[in-house]
Swiss-Prot record:
Residues 339-402 form the SH3 domain. The keyword Coiled coil applies. It comes from Homo sapiens. This is BAR/IMD domain-containing adapter protein 2-like 1. May function as adapter protein. Involved in the formation of clusters of actin bundles. Plays a role in the reorganization of the actin cytoskeleton in response to bacterial infection. It is found in: Cytoplasm, Cytoskeleton. Pfam families: IMD (PF08397), SH3_9 (PF14604). It comes from the Eukaryota. The lineage of its organism: Eukaryota, Metazoa, Chordata, Craniata, Vertebrata. The gene is BAIAP2L1.
Length: 511
């Protein structure tokens, strides 16, 4: 394909402009993209390092397992191998920055200046040569015009030959300049592309070596890694032997087995005794809902010796919900006979009414406790005479001592504060009339208490007469002796009641 000098000249100039207007700006963009690539790879290497550090930590956890120790070591080795490969990749990308990014940055600044100067020099020389050629051609035309109308033709002919030679030499010179300029421009362009290819080939060689090194390293370790996780349900022989020993233990106990403490053994004996009792006895009904009614005169029927056990029993009942095993341990520590059931004696009559889960009894009856623990003021026991079982208020009974007789004891004031303190002078043989207990009618009791408080405000100088010991008082419906002052007058006219604050879960506070 033949081209004229002007066409070649245009190709030369377009080549220079292509380098300056397309290649160099593209190179600048490539440098920016390469820097972003570097940042991404560095971030990937850091993230990979953190990831494989986590793999190593999990491997350390696995090494503590009796069946996964080998897998733990494999995880640690995988972590170290990949971190080593990441370090090698980091070194390769340092070369990428040094051999490509840094070199391109250095070349681009120099090349812009060089290409501008080269193109300008080419255009200037081409213009000068072209002007010289045109000037010689103009002189040749002038000589030819003069020689045509002149008589001395030989004189102009000699000059014409000289100008023709000059024009020819200058045409050859300018053509050679255009050809050399075009070649130089194309080579300059090629050198730049070649430089870019050469730098990336060098980096590719580093990456190739990195991949060969990685493949060699992974090929030497990967089969052994895969072998450790082929059978996930395989248990090491040592662990299997240990499991078999646990399945078939020897006849002699292990010397290092801890023995139970004596207190726990005694608590277990008590618990077994209660379990045996619950198995042999019929099914126990649930305790009534609500707290049992507490008689305000209960302490008057307790001996000093029995008042403390009663208070202890109330205290123990309040702490029952906290820890049953503790109360059983305390019962054992107090010396109670575990094999002997506790008995109580009734001090007030009690009527069950229509509730089949409650127990009815009269005053002075003996009840065997089937459950020695109170539940909200209720006890569960069996009547010694009727053999009936049921729940009853604990405040209607007192502990039965072995040497206690059936005689009525003298009521003594309780050492602990009671809800009301009477100033009536009661004789030793007289007894207080006890109203029929009915714990279900709390509202009627509250009204009766209000009426007694109103009657206490009236001023009366009545004093209860002492009953004669030689005359026996008749019994009322409750089984208690009828006092001689039941003549319709108020026996508690001189009683002054102190204001109290009653809390169902605590003793009254006297102000």
């Amino acid at each position: 394909m033949s081209r004229g000098p002007e066409e070649v000249n245009r190709l030369t100039e377009s080549t220079y402009r292509n380098v300056m207007e397309q290649f160099n700006p593209g190179l600048r963009n490539l440098i920016n993209l390469g820097k972003n690539y570097e940042k991404a790879v560095n971030a990937m290497i850091l993230a990979g390092k953190a990831y494989y550090d986590g793999v190593a930590k999990i491997g350390e956890i696995a090494t503590g397992s009796p069946v996964s120790t080998e897998l733990g070591h494999v995880l640690i080795e995988i972590s170290s191998t990949h971190k080593k490969l990441n370090e090698s990749l980091d070194e390769n990308f340092k070369k990428f920055h040094k051999e490509i990014i840094h070199e391109l940055e250095k070349k681009i600044e120099l090349d812009v200046k060089y290409m501008n100067a080269t193109l300008k020099r080419y255009q200037t020389e081409h213009k000068n040569k072209l002007e010289s050629l045109e000037k010689s051609q103009a002189e040749l035309k002038k000589i030819r015009r003069k020689s045509q109308g002149s008589r001395n033709a030989l004189k102009y002919e000699h000059k014409e030959i000289e100008y023709v030679e000059t024009v020819t030499s200058r045409q050859s010179e300018i053509q050679k300049f255009i050809a050399d300029g075009c070649k130089e421009a194309l080579l300059e362009e090629k050198r730049r592309f070649c430089f870019l290819v050469d730098k990336h080939c060098g980096f590719a060689n580093h990456i190739h070596y990195y991949h060969l090194q990685s493949a060699e390293l992974l090929n030497s370790k990967l089969p052994r890694w895969q072998e450790t996780c082929v059978d996930a349900i395989k248990v090491p022989e040592k662990i299997m032997n240990m499991i078999e020993e646990i399945k078939t233990p020897a006849s002699t106990p292990v010397s290092g087995t801890p023995q139970a403490s004596p207190m726990i053994e005694r608590s277990n004996v008590v618990r077994k005794d209660y379990d045996t009792l619950s198995k042999c006895s019929p099914k126990m009904p649930p305790a009534p809902s609500g707290r049992a009614y507490t008689s305000p005169l209960i302490d008057m029927f307790n001996n000093p010796a029995t008042a403390a056990p009663n208070s202890q029993r109330v205290n123990n009942s309040t702490g029952t919900s906290e820890d049953p095993s503790l109360q059983r341990s305390v019962s054992v520590a107090t010396g109670l006979n575990m094999m002997k059931k506790q008995k109580v004696k009734t001090i007030f009559p009690h009527t069950a009414g229509s509730n089949k889960t409650l127990l009815s009894f009269a005053q002075g009856d003996v009840i065997t406790l089937l459950i020695p623990e109170e539940k909200d003021g209720w006890l569960y026991g069996e009547h010694d005479v009727s053999k009936a079982r049921g729940w009853f208020p604990s405040s209607y009974t007192k502990l039965l001592e072995e040497n206690e007789t059936e005689a009525v004891t003298v009521p003594t004031p309780s050492p602990t504060p009671v809800r009301s303190i009477s100033t009536v002078n009661l004789s030793e043989n007289s007894s207080v009339v006890i109203p029929p207990p009915d714990y279900l009618e709390c509202l009627s009791m509250g009204a009766a208490a209000d009426r007694r408080a109103d009657s206490a405000r009236t001023t009366s100088t009545f004093k209860a007469p002492a009953s004669k010991p030689e005359t026996a008082a008749p019994n009322d419906a409750n089984g208690t002796a009828k006092p001689p002052f039941l003549s319709g007058e108020n026996p508690f006219a001189t009683v002054k009641l102190r204001p109290t604050v009653t809390n169902d879960r605590s003793a009254p506070i006297i102000r």
